[in-house]
Amino acid sequence: MKKNYLLLNFIVLLFSMTFGGYALQPTAADVYTPTVTDNEVSVFLETPFTNNIKVYAWIDKNTLFTEGYPGDKMTLMGTNADGTANIYKWTYNGDKKGVPTGVIFTENGNKFVERDQDFVNHGYYV
């Protein structure tokens, strides 16, 4: 009976840690070195911000490469070498031809830079 009681306590502990958020806490992101393939349309953003990072990219007002403003969510890839900023990547997965000409980066809908920026394929923005 004592073995069953210990097993039951262990299972309850694991369950509470897992679903209570204790066992699955994220660890510090790994240092990331940007990588691309020649045929992809992508950009990188280095920023200390972590909340709802998005990219808005276009050729003209009729040719958007992202969802409507503020755009598509960027993927957290890791950190810079000294760990002071996160590196995000966005890769276009649609069927439009060409490469965007303009880009805006946002956090929670707020622009990082007040003006539109030129889009550079595989560009690294800081």
Task: Please identify what each model-predicted range represents.
Residues 9-21:
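Bacterial N-terminal signal peptides
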Residues 30-34, 117-126:
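Extracellular beta-sheet/turn segments enriched in Thr/Pro/Gly and aliphatic residues
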Residues 48-96, 110-116:
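Aromatic-rich carbohydrate-binding modules that target alpha-glucans
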Residues 39-43:
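Structural beta-strand segments of beta-rich domains
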Residues 1-11:
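Bacterial N-terminal signal peptides that target proteins for export
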Residues 23-38:
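Low-complexity, acidic Ser/Thr/Pro-rich repeat tracts that form intrinsically disordered stalk/linker regions
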Residues 98-109:
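A short, solvent-exposed beta-strand micro-motif common in secreted/extracellular proteins
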Residues 35-37, 95-99:
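Flexible, charged surface loops at secondary-structure boundaries
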